[in-house]
């Protein structure tokens, strides 16, 4: 019962955010040059504080997002006429909900193909799913996610990106690991989400290409 209530609440929150994005997309003061799309790790990414670019940056992340929802609502996330690059970071919630990898890949490929069709001059950066900390104290938040599952999905992402000249795979996973192969303590708030220090590492990896 409690889990269902939480799911219902999250769905309503997601719908509110998507509605807001659609409204904002109608009359932007500036056309977006760089768009960041994905789940909560994107939504909470302070791009304007940690990244520098002459291009106008827009964040269109949504907490709790799975790949099927991004596919369904893609028009709320990608907009404009002068989009230079799109940064896509998504997949950890698919793992958390035990969605089959093939289904995740089908959704991501559909998203990539839709963007390439509508934005043929836009480059897409498919960012690796980030590692988690599998320490016992984070179990409730991390749930069934494991770095083994994440690495398997990242390998599939890398292969998917190689199939399209308009897509690049960006490995951030490796930069966030500690000496035992877990998401480093300094880089996380709860074993899953990033701390400011973690976002600095993410920003460093992306700064070279923004």
Predicted regions mapped to residue ranges:
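N-terminal secretory targeting modules
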Residues: 1-36, 42, 46-53, 164
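Acidic/histidine-rich helix-loop elements
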Residues: 7-8, 54-67, 191
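Conserved beta-strand elements of the Class I
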Residues: 34-37, 58, 86
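Oxyanion-hole/transition-state-stabilizing segment in secreted/luminal serine hydrolases
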Residues: 43-50, 56, 69-106, 131-133
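Histidine-centered active-site loop/cap adjacent to the catalytic His
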Residues: 70, 188-210
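Alpha-helix N-cap and loop-to-helix initiation/capping positions
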Residues: 99-107, 141-149, 186, 190, ...
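A short helix->loop->beta-strand "cap" motif at the edges of active sites that frequently abuts
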Residues: 119-123
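Substrate-gating cap/lid alpha-helix
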Residues: 134-171
């Amino acid at each position: 019962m409690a889990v269902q209530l939480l799911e219902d609440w999250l769905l309503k929150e997601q719908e509110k955010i998507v509605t807001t994005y659609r409204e904002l997309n109608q009359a932007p003061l500036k056309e977006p040059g760089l768009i960041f799309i994905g789940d909560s790790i994107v939504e909470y990414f302070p791009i304007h504080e940690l990244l520098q670019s002459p291009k106008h940056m827009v964040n269109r992340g949504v907490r709790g997002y799975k790949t099927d929802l991004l596919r369904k609502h893609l028009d709320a996330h990608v907009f404009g006429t002068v989009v230079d690059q799109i940064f896509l970071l998504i997949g950890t919630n698919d793992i958390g909900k035990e969605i089959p990898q093939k289904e995740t890949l089908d959704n991501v490929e559909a998203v990539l193909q839709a963007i390439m069709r509508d934005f043929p001059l836009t480059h897409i950066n498919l960012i690796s799913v980030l590692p988690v900390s599998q320490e016992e104290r984070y179990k409730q938040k991390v749930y069934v996610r494991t770095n083994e599952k994440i690495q398997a999905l990242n390998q599939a992402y890398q292969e998917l990106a190689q199939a399209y000249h308009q897509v690049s795979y960006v490995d951030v996973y490796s930069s966030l690991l500690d000496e035992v192969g877990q998401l480093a303590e300094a880089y996380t708030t709860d074993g899953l989400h990033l701390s400011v220090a973690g976002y600095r590492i993410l920003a460093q990896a992306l700064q070279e290409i923004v």
